[in-house]
């Protein structure tokens, strides 16, 4: 709700006195369906929560952050922003938009008190798939450790402490990031082969 978001900074300042940081961590996935099988409402909801929610929260709080001696903006994207997952075209697009938005803000805010960190998590135990009406997806033939939220939160805070530009959470995210840099087509093919069963 854009209007409620616009009113949020004043409410937070009234309760807490000041805002020194913002972590945009809202995210939902789409049902595991091909693009042409998705209805408009599902597509719009994914973009509204994942991208527009992050954008509106950032625009609402950034003026306050810029007035602080030091402040930090953290946007949580996803490994799905750079590695395409079958049945998650809209989710990937929304998180790719968050990734590029965050990288652009990092550049725009150089020379200001606001530091910016981009977070790219891999598989985490969050219940996001169950919220979308399905089971947690598992890659065929893969034993990928799932990151616990508490571990991810600690690593995120460590990244903020050292003013990291970009942090990959989880061994899967780190591996796929390296592979994607070496060969985007190969990385996409590996994910497609291991995740294609989700669409059958």
Question: Which residue stretches match the model-derived regions?
Answer:
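A glycine-rich helix->loop->beta "capping" turn
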Residues: 11-22, 31
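Active-site loop immediately N-terminal to the catalytic Tyr-X3-Lys motif
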Residues: 36, 85-89
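SDR active-site lid
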Residues: 107-171, 189
């Amino acid at each position: 709700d854009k209007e409620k978001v616009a009113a949020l900074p004043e409410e937070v300042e009234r309760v807490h006195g000041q805002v020194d940081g913002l972590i945009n961590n809202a995210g939902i996935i789409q049902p595991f369906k091909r693009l042409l099988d998705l209805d408009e409402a599902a597509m719009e909801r994914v973009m509204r929560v994942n991208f527009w929610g992050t954008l509106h929260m950032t625009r609402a709080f950034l003026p306050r952050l810029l007035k602080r001696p030091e402040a930090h903006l953290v946007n949580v994207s996803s490994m799905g922003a750079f590695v395409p997952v079958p049945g998650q075209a809209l989710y990937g697009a929304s998180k790719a938009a968050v990734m590029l938005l965050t990288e652009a803000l990092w550049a725009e805010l150089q020379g200001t008190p606001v530091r910016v960190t981009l977070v790219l998590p891999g598989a985490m135990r969050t219940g996001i798939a169950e919220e979308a009406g399905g089971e947690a997806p598992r890659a065929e033939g893969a034993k990928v450790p799932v990151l616990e939220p508490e571990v991810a939160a600690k690593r995120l805070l460590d990244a903020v402490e050292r003013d990291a530009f970009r942090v990959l959470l989880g061994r899967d995210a780190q591996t796929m990031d390296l592979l994607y840099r070496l060969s985007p087509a190969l990385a996409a093919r590996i994910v497609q082969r291991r995740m294609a069963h989700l669409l059958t």
